[in-house]
Swiss-Prot record:
Gene name of the encoded protein: lspA
Active site positions, chain numbering: D120, D138
Species of provenance: Buchnera aphidicola subsp. Schizaphis graminum (strain Sg)
Localization, UniProt: Cell inner membrane
Organism classification: Bacteria, Pseudomonadati, Pseudomonadota, Gammaproteobacteria, Enterobacterales
Reaction equations catalysed: Release of signal peptides from bacterial membrane prolipoproteins. Hydrolyzes -Xaa-Yaa-Zaa-|-(S,diacylglyceryl)Cys-, in which Xaa is hydrophobic (preferably Leu), and Yaa (Ala or Ser) and Zaa (Gly or Ala) have small, neutral side chains
Top EC class, one word: hydrolase
Protein name, entry field: Lipoprotein signal peptidase
Length: 156
């Protein structure tokens, strides 16, 4: 990836990290832990602390996962950066998808460093069925992964 094109993706990454950071800050300042605030019929704000990974995997462990996930996150972030440096300018969708994943990984890493857990608050639901509670960083990672899967599916 040429240096002059870095700034576009760096701005996207910083924007997502900033929105993620301040949305979590707002939740911390306005909702108590486990407090729920209805936004509209399929969306609640629900303040939870995730001590594990995606879908609360490992959250029931006795604390070792905190250090494991911290180190794992750093390794993933460094690997993504290394991969992105090798991209060519024409790989715009790839660069964007990895930028979204990188931004989400950094956003959640900031939480792990600051609090020892990740702040989740987006509760999508239909009647009594609730999807796993997530945050902006998680959503960014999800969209980036969908883009990669879609690109790989249609190129195979």
């Amino acid at each position: 990836m040429k240096r002059k094109y870095y700034w576009i993706y760096i701005n996207i990454i910083f924007f997502i990290i900033t929105v993620d950071f301040y949305s979590k800050k707002w939740i911390l300042n306005h909702l108590n832990i486990y407090e729920k605030q209805k936004v509209f019929f399929i969306l609640n704000l629900f303040h939870v602390h995730n001590f594990g990974a995606a879908f609360s995997i490992l959250s029931d462990q006795n604390g070792w996962q905190k250090y494991f996930l911290l180190i794992f996150s750093i390794i993933i972030i460094l690997a993504i950066i290394k991969i992105m440096i090798k991209f060519k300018k024409k790989d715009k969708n790839k660069i964007l998808s990895y930028s979204l994943i990188l931004a989400g990984a950094i956003g959640n890493l900031i939480d792990r460093i600051n609090y020892g857990f990740v702040i989740d608050f987006i509760d999508l639901h239909f009647k009594s069925w609730h999807f796993a509670t997530f945050n902006i960083a998680d959503f960014s990672i999800f969209i980036g992964m969908i883009m990669i899967i879609k690109k790989n599916y249609y190129n195979s």
